[in-house]
Design a protein with these regions (language model features):
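Intrinsically disordered, low-complexity terminal tails/loops enriched in metal-binding residues
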Residues: 12-154
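Bacterial N-terminal signal peptides
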Residues: 1-7
Length: 154
């Protein structure tokens, strides 16, 4: 019991340190104002979706979100996950598998009325599991509260 009490504060500090790193590194990679947008990480039976929605329909922020996700989708299709690695850390769950499995999945960019999204789709079950792990890690780091709110079918 005493060990649990000692370990918990360290876990909270590690989480805080991770949050701080994500905020600092995210602002260096993402050109839009994160306080004006919400990240959503939505798993599906065949992969998942990363969606960024601008809160107040600000056209400048929407354009910045779209430019960012268009660029990220092109990188992901090539197996380049350097931006998520920089933002979340190189040990991010699922990251290595996604980078090495780019030939076994399709990556699609699409615009939404208030932002944009990227879909990651595969028929390879281990890769789908890696996508889910990667989405869950982003959900934890961004604390968006959107994981599993929608189980999209692709």
């Amino acid at each position: 019991l005493a060990l649990g009490l000692v370990a918990f504060p360290f876990a909270v500090r590690a989480d805080d340190a991770q949050q701080n790193m994500v905020m600092e590194h995210g602002s260096q990679v993402m050109p839009f104002d994160e306080s004006q947008a919400m990240h959503m990480f939505l798993p599906s039976a065949t992969g998942g979706v990363v969606e960024i929605v601008v809160h107040d329909m600000n056209p400048t922020q929407i354009a910045l979100v779209r430019a960012h996700l268009l660029q990220e989708a092109a990188k992901f299709a090539r197996g380049d996950y350097s931006d998520p690695a920089y933002i979340h850390g190189k040990t991010m769950p699922g990251l290595v598998q996604l980078a090495s499995g780019s030939s076994r999945m399709s990556v699609h960019y699409f615009e939404t009325p208030s932002g944009a999204a990227i879909t990651l789709v595969s028929t390879d079950q281990p890769l789908i599991t890696a996508i889910h792990e990667w989405l869950a890690a982003q959900e934890r780091d961004h604390k968006s509260g959107q994981m599993n709110h929608c189980d999209m079918q692709m």
